[in-house]
Curated annotation (Swiss-Prot):
Gene (UniProt): NPF2.7
GO terms under biological process: nitrate assimilation; nitrate transmembrane transport; response to acidic pH
Induction remark: Not regulated by light or plant N status. Up-regulated at the protein level but not at the transcript level by medium acidification.
GO CC term (a single one): plasma membrane
SUPFAM superfamilies with a match to the protein in the record: MFS general substrate transporter
Cellular location(s): Cell membrane
Protein name per UniProt: Protein NRT1/ PTR FAMILY 2.7
Lineage of the organism: Eukaryota, Viridiplantae, Streptophyta, Embryophyta, Tracheophyta
Length: 558
C-alpha cells in the first residue's frame, strides 16, 4: 500500500510542475498524515480511557462516567462544524488547523496536571468503603476546562485535516486515495493509543500516559507548521450558509410567480436550467424586472440567485434524509463504546499469568478491524466488485453494508451479555470480586463486526458528503459526518438516561441489570432504520458521481 502512494507521488509531481508552483500535490502527504497521526494518538490517548479515569481518579459512578464520556465525545464531533464554517467563510483550513492543534496541546497538558497534582483530584476511595469523597468545585472546574480545551482542539482538526488534505489534489482519484489513507491513519493511531498509551495509564501512571499524549500533540503541531510552505492554501469563499438563505428568501418573495420552462428566464452562470426536483426553489433564480444590472451581475442577492446557487441548495436538502438515517446508525455504536468498557470492567481481563487487558483498550479491536478492512475494501473487495459488475460500489451502497454489520454486532453483543448474566446469576465470580468468571475475549467478535461495518459506512458517508455538497461547502461537507456522530453521542446519552428512568436495566452495578435487553432494543431500532435508509437511497440521485479514469455515469443504480 505504501508503494502505491510513493508511485502516485512520483507520477503526480513529475507530470505537473505547475502544481509545485502553486503548492499542493503529493509532497504535502507526509506532513498531513504525520500531523493526523500525532493528533489522533493524543486525542484517543485521553478519550478512550476517560470513563476509567473518572471512575478511579474522580470517584464518579459508572453510568454517570459513561454519560460524561458520551457528552465529551459529542462535543468533539460537533466542533468540526464550527471549524468548517470558520475555514470556508473566513480563514481557510490551514490557519484553523494550526490554532486548533495548539488549543488541543493546552488542554491535554492541563489534563496531565490533574493526574500529576494530588490537589487537583479527590482522595481515593478507601478499601471496602461505600462512601467516596466527591471532587470539589475547583477540581471539577480544572478537569472540565482541560477536557473542554482538548475537545475543542481535537474537533477543530479532525475533519478540517480531511478537507485540507483532499484540497491538495486535483484528481478525484487522488482525493479518494487520500481519504482512504486518512481513515487508515486515524484508526491506526487509535489502535496505538488504545494499546500503548491506555496500558501505560492503567499499569504505570496516568501522568506518564497523558504525558505521552502531550508529546504526540506537540510533535504533530511542529510537523504541520513546518510544512506550511508546501501547502495549497484555499481561499475562503464567504459563508456558504448565506448563499443557502438567499435561495430560501428569494424563492419565498416570488412564491406566486409561475415557474418557467425557458432557460432565458433564469439567471445562470454555469448551469443553464434548474432541475425539476424541489421546483418551488427554482423561483429564486427566476429573473424579474430590474433584478440584473447592465453588466449581468445581480442587484440584490436576497431577491435573485443564480441557477447554481439553487442547485447547491437542493443538494443540501437531498442529503438531510440520509443524514437522519446515519444518526440512528451511529447511536447504537456510541452506546456500545460506553457499555463495552463497563462490561469489560466486570469480566475476566487476564491474558496469561501476569497480563491484564485494560478496559479502555477494548476499542482497539474495533480500530484494528476497521484499519484492516479499509485496506481489504480498497485493494480487494472494491476492485473485485468493479471487475464483476463493471460499476463502482457507490457511497450509499457502502453505508448500507455498514448498517447491516452494525445490526449484526448489536445482536451478537446481546447474546454475549446474556451469557455473562447467567454466569453472574449462578454466582461464578473471580474470588470475592464482582468480576464474572467469563473471559473478556467474548466481546472481541462483536467489536470486530463493528469495525468491519465502520470500514464501510464511515468513509462512505464522508465521500458522499464531499462529492455531493457544493464546492464552497467542502469543509462543511466533510464535517457533516462528524456532526451527525456528535448528535448520536447526545442521543445515546439521552437514551441511556431514559432507560435508567423507565427500567431497571442499567443500574450502576450492571451485574444487577439487563444490558442484553438494551442491545436487543438497539437491534430492533437498527432494522427499522435500515429499512428507512434503503428507501432514502433508492429515491436519491447522485449529483457528482464521477471518476477520472472512467466514463461518467449518468444514472447510478443503488
Amino acid at each position: 500500500m505504501a508503494s502505491s502512494v510513493t508511485g502516485d507521488a512520483e507520477t503526480a509531481i513529475s507530470a505537473d510542475s505547475s502544481t509545485k508552483r502553486r503548492g499542493g500535490g503529493w509532497i504535502t502527504f507526509p506532513f498531513m498524515i504525520a500531523t493526523l497521526l500525532g493528533l489522533t494518538i493524543a486525542a484517543w490517548g485521553w478519550l478512550l480511557n476517560l470513563i476509567v479515569y473518572l471512575i478511579e481518579e474522580f470517584n464518579v459512578k459508572s453510568i454517570a462516567a459513561a454519560q460524561i464520556a458520551n457528552i465529551v465525545s459529542g462535543c468533539i464531533c460537533m466542533v468540526p462544524a464550527v471549524a468548517a464554517i470558520a475555514s470556508d467563510s473566513f480563514f481557510g483550513t490551514i490557519p484553523v488547523i494550526s490554532v486548533s492543534a495548539f488549543i488541543s496541546l493546552m488542554g491535554v497538558a492541563l489534563l496531565t496536571l490533574t493526574a500529576s497534582l494530588d490537589t487537583l483530584r479527590p482522595r481515593p476511595c478507601e478499601t471496602a468503603s461505600i462512601l467516596c469523597q466527591s471532587p470539589s468545585k475547583t477540581q471539577l472546574g480544572v478537569l472540565y476546562t482541560a477536557i473542554t480545551l482538548a475537545s475543542i482542539g481535537t474537533g477543530g482538526t479532525r475533519f478540517t485535516l480531511a478537507t485540507a488534505g483532499a484540497n491538495q489534489y486535483e484528481k478525484t482519484k487522488d482525493q479518494g486515495s487520500f481519504f482512504n489513507w486518512f481513515f487508515f491513519t486515524t484508526y491506526l493511531a487509535g489502535a496505538i493509543s488504545a494499546t500503548a498509551i491506555v496500558y501505560t495509564e492503567d499499569n504505570i501512571s496516568w501522568t506518564l500516559g497523558f504525558g505521552l499524549s502531550v508529546a504526540a500533540n506537540f510533535f504533530s503541531f511542529l510537523v504541520f507548521v513546518s510544512g506550511k510552505r508546501f501547502y495549497k492554501h484555499d481561499k475562503p469563499l464567504g459563508s456558504p450558509f448565506t448563499s443557502l438563505l438567499c435561495v430560501i428568501f428569494a424563492a419565498l418573495r416570488k412564491r406566486k410567480a409561475v415557474v418557467s420552462t425557458n432557460e432565458k428566464d433564469y439567471h445562470n452562470e454555469s448551469i443553464t436550467m434548474p432541475t425539476k426536483s424541489f421546483r418551488f426553489f427554482n423561483r429564486a433564480a427566476l429573473k424579474q424586472e430590474d433584478e440584473v444590472k447592465p453588466d449581468g451581475t445581480i442587484r440584490n442577492p436576497w431577491r435573485l440567485c443564480s441557477v447554481q446557487q439553487v442547485e447547491d441548495f437542493k443538494a443540501v436538502i437531498r442529503i438531510i434524509p440520509l443524514a437522519l438515517a446515519t444518526i440512528f446508525l451511529s447511536t447504537p455504536i456510541a452506546m456500545q463504546l460506553s457499555l463495552t468498557v463497563l462490561q469489560g470492567l466486570v469480566m475476566d481481563r487476564r491474558l496469561g499469568p501476569s497480563f491484564k487487558i485494560p478496559a479502555g483498550s477494548l476499542q482497539v479491536i474495533t480500530l484494528l478491524s476497521t484499519c484492516l478492512f479499509i485496506i481489504v475494501n480498497d485493494r480487494v473487495l472494491y476492485p473485485f466488485y468493479q471487475k464483476l459488475t463493471g460499476k463502482h460500489l457507490t457511497p450509499l451502497q457502502r453505508v448500507g453494508i455498514g448498517h447491516a454489520f452494525n445490526i449484526l454486532s448489536m445482536a451478537v453483543t446481546a447474546i454475549v451479555e446474556a451469557k455473562r448474566l447467567k454466569i453472574v446469576q449462578k454466582g461464578h465470580f473471580l474470588g470475592s470480586s464482582s468480576v464474572a468468571d467469563m473471559s473478556v475475549l467474548w466481546l472481541f467478535p462483536p467489536l470486530v463486526i463493528v469495525g468491519i461495518g465502520e470500514a464501510f459506512h464511515f468513509p462512505g458517508n464522508v465521500a458522499l458528503c464531499y462529492q455531493e455538497f457544493p464546492e464552497s461547502m467542502r469543509s462543511t461537507a466533510t464535517s457533516i459526518t462528524s456532526v451527525v456522530i456528535g448528535i448520536c453521542f447526545y442521543t445515546s446519552t439521552a437514551l441511556i438516561d431514559l432507560i435508567q428512568r423507565t427500567t431497571a436495566w442499567l443500574p450502576d452495578d450492571i451485574n444487577h441489570g439487563r444490558v442484553d435487553n438494551v442491545y436487543w432494543i438497539l437491534v430492533i431500532g437498527g432494522v427499522l432504520n435500515l429499512g428507512y435508509f434503503l428507501v432514502c437511497s433508492w429515491l436519491y440521485r447522485y449529483r457528482n458521481l464521477k471518476d477520472d479514469d472512467h466514463k461518467q455515469a449518468a444514472n447510478v443504480s443503488h
